[in-house]
Amino acid sequence: MPDMKLVVIYPRPKDVDAFEKVYQDEHVPLAVAKLGGKTKMVATKILGSPQGTAPFYRIAEVYFPSIHALEACAASEGGKEALAHAVKISAGGAPIFLVAEEETFTFTKTVNA
């Protein structure tokens, strides 16, 4: 069964340093403590875009073993608290929340003949 994940996409904040402080010091520990049923969390910082400055700054992916586990987490008091905090700290506008099913494609290294 593929992994299910909650994806949170944060717009570029007006003050990157202030956002990073609250994200690292408050939000990540809160998410780790309150999001029940998760199996891992991947946090990505967006460095740029081929078109110039990227409109988004961070992507958080929280993995769950099933859609039922993700839904139970989102409906829980801890899940609601963590999601509300994500909205509160998003200093560049409202974050985007997505539910996704992951597919993985693995490539092997080939040698040109």
List the model feature ranges, each with a label.
Residues 1-113:
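Macromolecular interaction modules
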